[in-house]
Amino acid sequence: MAAAAERPRGGVRLVLGADAVIAAWVGSRIGIADFGPSAAIGIAEGGRLVAGVVYSAWRPSPGSLEMSVAALTPRWCCRRVLAALFGYPFGQLGAGRAQATVRRGNRSARRFVERLGFRYEGMARAAWPTGEDAAVYAMLRHECRWVGDQGSGIRCPIPDP
């Protein structure tokens, strides 16, 4: 992986500039083949990806996007990494809203996004790529406890659709 990396703690590193690789990795784990125009941040440990976030469906007005997350282990999840992952949409892009859509039956993923601070908004019938129902969660910028007003300083632009 010839991408830029930042080291937020111990052996965990942020991986930037490898959007396609990270998106394919995340997509293969959550069952999404194509995110469309997107950006991604990976989290690596020992030279391999252990987690990744894909930022897609960016709408400058009203300032919203979709965050898709996959992970092999919870060990990557610390305050400094979360500050970077949420600093990108809320700090750099100036988004006012981030959405996470989770397969209805994936209880562990639903608990995870709730612990991050996403709030349940409703069920989208047959909205998952497999035809299953999807739980829709969202977080507003002022609800995000992971970043201050300045964001993280991470720069990874989402291309215009």
Where are these regions (language model features)?
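Conserved acetyl-CoA binding element of GNAT-fold acetyltransferases
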Residues: 61-73, 101
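Conserved catalytic-core motifs of GNAT/GCN5-like acyltransferases
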Residues: 101, 119-134
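Conserved active-site alpha-helix within GNAT-family acetyltransferase domains
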Residues: 105-122
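C-terminal "cap" of GNAT-fold acetyltransferases
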Residues: 127-159
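Conserved GNAT acetyl-CoA-binding A-motif
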Residues: 91-102
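Conserved beta-strand in the GNAT
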Residues: 48-57
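A short helix-loop-beta-strand connector motif used in the catalytic cores of GNAT acetyltransferases and
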Residues: 31-42, 62
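Short amphipathic alpha-helix that is part of the acyltransferase structural core
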Residues: 1-30
